[in-house]
Amino acid sequence: MIRIVARQVIKKDCIEKYQGLVKELVEKSRKEDGCLSYTSNQSLSDERVHCFIEDWQDQAAIDAHNATEHFQRIIPQFATLFDDKEQVELYRQII
């Protein structure tokens, strides 16, 4: 299992647009083969800070996800909504 944690800081005036795009991305991604969990989360201390926490069966599932129509269409739209560069980290479960 591979976990992806992708953190974004959204421009204050773009939060609503971001959340609309995220809704579609999450709904479609959850239906993909190899997707174990896919959530979008918002910080309790700063409404502009969001993160995806994604659990995938393996790298092949991630590669397939990254090639989907919805990923290819939605992800580029995020770039104009961010206040800062997205931070993405991959994890493996140890316990």
Go through the PLM ranges and name each one.
Residues 14-37, 73, 78:
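Short amphipathic alpha-helical segments
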Residues 66-72:
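Long, charge-enriched, surface-exposed interaction segments in small proteins/subunits
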Residues 2-8, 39-66:
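Short, well-ordered beta-strand segments in beta-rich or mixed alpha/beta enzyme
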Residues 1-2, 95:
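Absolute protein N-terminus
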Residues 10-12:
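Beta-strand elements of well-folded, non-transmembrane domains
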Residues 39-48, 76-95:
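Glycine-rich beta-strand-turn "strand-cap" elements at beta-sheet edges
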